[in-house]
């Protein structure tokens, strides 16, 4: 039962109907932009685009040859991602860009390895941000503010992350510091937690010790019980506060 006290004014209700991805799929073969815009989605998080065969957003799709020169625009393939993001921008929705790769439920994993060179991976992220916010490589000036580092590195299987928790912590520290150094006005966060509260605790303790930036903490659940979501939110809030992130 929900009780509403109409005598109290608390201000505007925070919009909570954000979505994953945009109104188009498979290069525009499906385009739901009219309905998408009408829904007024405040945010679109870019993860698992065109699942299960993505051709956009993921770093391995944009920068397919990791051995190439990351400063050369010729080594980037932006076209599909440009189109996907433009459809979202045209609908008036803000983008949360997940830097990383899509989940792989296949037997053979292609892109969930730990980056061979984390510093270079961070530099690639910076070039992608420049493309969408500063016009680099025939890019745009979309002022995408939220940049999320990876997705679900806490999963048991290697569908999302083949490394250890410590490997992810290191990737987060390196890339978050590099991004904030290049773009101090942007928001960097993660880890897009799926399940494990012990991972959450260790992550927060580690980045606090390393003085790594955390502008937002991202998490989600696979559940249909509202009470469980509320309990998880309270648990994460307590961990954030205990580790000095009360401002998030």
Range-by-range predicted roles:
Residues 59-61, 110-112, 161-165, 202-205, ...:
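Short, glycine/charged-enriched secondary-structure capping and boundary segments
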Residues 116, 162-167, 194, 224-227:
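Alpha-helix capping and helix-loop boundary segments enriched in small/acidic/polar residues
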Residues 1-146, 166-190, 212, 241-246:
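Non-catalytic accessory regions flanking glycosidase/transglycosidase catalytic cores in CAZymes
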Residues 28-29, 54, 105-109, 156-159, ...:
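Extracytoplasmic/secreted cell-surface and envelope-processing proteins
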Residues 141, 147-151, 156-163:
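N-terminal/domain-start segments enriched in small and hydrophobic, helix-friendly residues
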Residues 102, 154, 195:
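Short, glycine/serine-rich, charged loops/turns that create anion-binding
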Residues 97, 125, 143-151, 186, ...:
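Aromatic- and acid-rich polysaccharide-binding/catalytic face
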